[in-house]
Amino acid sequence: MTNCTFRAAVPGDEALILDFIHQLAIYERMDDQVVATPELLTEWIFEKQKAEVVFAEVDGQPVGFTLFFHNFSTFLGRAGIYLEDLFVLPEHRGKGYGKALLNNLARIAVERGCGRLEWSCLDWNKPSIDFYTKRMQAIPMDEWTVYRLTGDTLLAAANDI
């Protein structure tokens, strides 16, 4: 791996973040679902500070990114970090940057006293699953199912009090 450095996103990086989000969405076959805008990223990442972004850079050029936020484990009684997005540009894959990004995020979790680092992976994404289980030695949480409310169902639930 060539001189990989990490840089936290700052205001002005919104277009770069959005570009990574779009490229990840294309890889995940979900590009039609991206509605994020630079303005929304400014609001939620930089103004409200609800998520953080770290870029992996080589010679000052971004090659990958992570977007993450804190969650909380009632069982552990402490915060954890939830990795929402991890993406390495196709031309830079297989060079250790994904592992470096995850290791960097693990370091952040340990420094902040977090009890765990977790994320989700699409069940068809065998290259990522193999990477997580073999290279990172992550444990799949097969007994859990993710549930989600969005759009009209979220509004209906909010109004059904």
Q: What kind of region is each of these model predictions?
A:
Residues T5-D19:
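A short beta-loop-alpha structural element at the N-terminal edge
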Residues K99, D123-E143:
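Conserved active-site alpha-helix within GNAT-family acetyltransferase domains
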Residues H92, G96-N104:
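Conserved acetyl-CoA pyrophosphate-binding loop and the N-cap/start of the following alpha-helix
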Residues V110-S120:
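Conserved GNAT acetyl-CoA-binding A-motif
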Residues L18-E43:
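Conserved GNAT-fold acetyl-CoA-binding loop/helix
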Residues W119-S128, R148-T150:
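Conserved beta-strand-loop-alpha-helix junction that forms the acyl-donor binding cleft
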Residues E43-F55, Y82:
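A short helix-loop-beta-strand connector motif used in the catalytic cores of GNAT acetyltransferases and
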Residues V53-F55, Q61-H70:
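Conserved beta-strand in the GNAT
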